[in-house]
Amino acid sequence: MAPGFPIFIGDIKIRTSEALYQACRFPHLPDVQRAIIREASPMTAKMKSKPHCRHSRADWDDVRIKIMRWCLRIKLFQNWTTFAVELERTEDFPIVEESHKDSFWGAIPDEDNHLYGTNALGRLLMELREEARNIHEESVVINTPNLEQFLLFGEPIPRITCRLKQQPSVVKSKSEKSDIEQIFLFEE
């Protein structure tokens, strides 16, 4: 959950990709979406969604990776000169969301400090890093996921065109590899 990379859906400013992701849980509840999107930090956006989780879209578990991928792509391409640099600084090292309780989005260390879990967020970020390396266009069109009821504030979410200002320049930093013992694959 990294703040500092705002997203625009039309003229709606969303401060974090986590807020957009959480809002997408509730396409049928525009007031809940507004409350989530008003939050300034990723964590408070997530916490704002918690009381409403039982009202999540019926297919949430089936579509959450697709929606997170879409949110992260918007985050990257609307913050191209900064977020692409952050991704490139990871070089070719694994990106792991280390967590103490979420083995789906992250990976949990065991008593020997080996990480176990799906690491879905880390995998999506590595996928995005590879995509960013292969972008040579001046603009990118991000289509919405092909989902029923993909709405924000009661309106269909449009595809988004991002104009890339310039290719990011990267200052390489020294990194250490994570000790990943086992990671399970997930499907799109």
Report residues per predicted region.
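Charged, low-complexity intrinsically disordered segments
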Residues: 1-188
